Amino acid sequence: MLSPKLSTLAMSALLAVGVQAQTGAPEMTQAEIETGKKIYFERCAGCHGVLRKGATGKNLEPHWKKTAKDGSTQEGGTLKLGTQRLEKIIGLGTEGGMVNYDDILSKDEINIMARYIQRTPDVPPEFSLKDMEASWKLLVPVDQRPKKQMNKINLKNVFAITLRDTGKLALIDGDTKQIWQVLDTGYAVHISRMSASGRYVYTVGRDGLVTLIDLWYETPTTVATVKLGADARSVDTSKFKGYEDKYLIGGTYWPPQYSIMDGESLKPMKIVSTRGNTVDGEYHPEPRVASIVASMSKPEWVVNVKETGQIMLVDYTDIKNLKTTTIESAKFLHDGGWDMSKRYFLVAANASHKIAAVDTKTGKLAALVDTKKIPHPGRGANFVHPTYGPVWATGHLGDAVITLISTPSEKKEHAKFKAHNWKVVQELKTGGAGNLFVKTHPKSTHLWADMPMNPERENAEAVYVYDLKDLNKAPVKLDVAKDSGLPETKALRRATHPEYNEAGDEVWISLWGGKTDQSAIVIYDDKTLKLKKVITDPRIVTPTGKFNVFNTQHDVY
Ligand code: DHE
């Protein structure tokens, strides 16, 4: 069973690599090597890196040697682990956060992967501005697009929903809960972000394809596409006053770089490599671009470079003479979100077990906060804690807590909380590790947390809701899979990514089933926690991230 669509460009980029001579690695046929490359790209590279040097996941080079600060050395590698041990790890997962692949890959594929990762990593080709230009498709020039909204849909309450394994995006009308349109996009769209105007949806696929969708047509229409590289995760527009939607930035995992485009046509303008030194002073050949966000304080983007731990503030006022401020934080930067004041961006340095906070006004690191294992905020959640004032919350992939960090506020009534700022003020207990996303809304008194990566079905298929008025109370568990009314399936149906509607009174959860199983979007009333609606449709296949236009446009969380 192989996951299907992977864009031809991304695949040919990876498959173009020749077979190298291997010492000590088990024999493989050419066909097995091709299968290994495809599965590695689709399933493994995100955590372990194309060059397999490790980040969220472990180093998977055939042989590695580490020298500690005290001069002692440690050696290891996939060759040392051998095929049998690797098959076990891939099949059953590990306590360190690696999920079990025995319900995703066949036995033969697990065996192929166990042998493939004992080979020297294949290095895919680079991707230049010329390659980007060649991939650029302007399907509808800006002056030929509608001059006003041509439909009657309340665009602010539209949800863009990733249909992960189909290479498609569903646009659902949040008012009527009807599917408005399902569009082709890149493979396994990672995130959708909105234009400052709320008219356009930008999506980026894992295969590096950016799709620009115009919501003003009778039905949503793709007006431009462009490739950023072979593997990407992030995209955002310029949002500062006077620059709204003028530019778009996209970050790639491979090659490690970010690209700047025209915001309305996607015309490629510039590529900047992120290769360089880590905060520990070592050169890294694959420092991937993780989250990117448009600053509210200045005409800048916050670009988080995973492996180096460097946070770049990219000033977009003069693209030809680009100025960048590079802020040292901690290695393995991943996802993050704004604090309540939208002055500080908090980003997880996940495998360093830290949260880094950037002050976008001063352009400096505001804090580096130690947390429990592998924080994974998504965008996090902001609320006023009854005892500690404004806090930002993150869940953890690697531990059974939700961490609450006190954040600064210029409001007079919050002055008394200053002494707590940048401290972990509370850790809410969860039923286990494996959380990916937490969410709340300014109008809500609830904090929602999923647990899709927990190995227990009863946790992975449920969400937990905390009462913000009394955080010492145990959370309410909602069994999303059961509430969907769908029959139980062999593969886990992971309940993930709570997202509010525009009004802030409903929470939408993805019930992410196997590729051939019926999945669903399950909607709850935020006040009563009662089931409100289940959206099932043969087109809703492997739904994951959901992005409400208004909340994404205004960073409401
Ligand atoms: Fe994500 C955000 C990277 C796996 C769903 N994910 C992000 C961001 C990064 C990232 C860098 C922040 C983007 C930004 O804000 O600019 N994700 C990665 C990986 O490297 C990783 C671990 C492995 C991979 O191969 O991609 C990974 N992510 C997943 C999944 O398996 C998820 C659960 C399902 C899916 O669709 O692939 C998933 N990631 C998401 C979602 C967001 C996200 C829904 C956006 C959260 C938000 O609310 O903004």
Region roles according to the model:
Residues M1-A21:
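Gram-negative bacterial Sec-dependent N-terminal signal peptides
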Residues P26-K37, K53-G91:
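Gly/Gly-Pro-rich "capping" loops immediately C-terminal to redox-active cysteine motifs
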Residues G46:
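Short, cysteine/histidine-rich loop/knuckle motifs that typically chelate Zn2+
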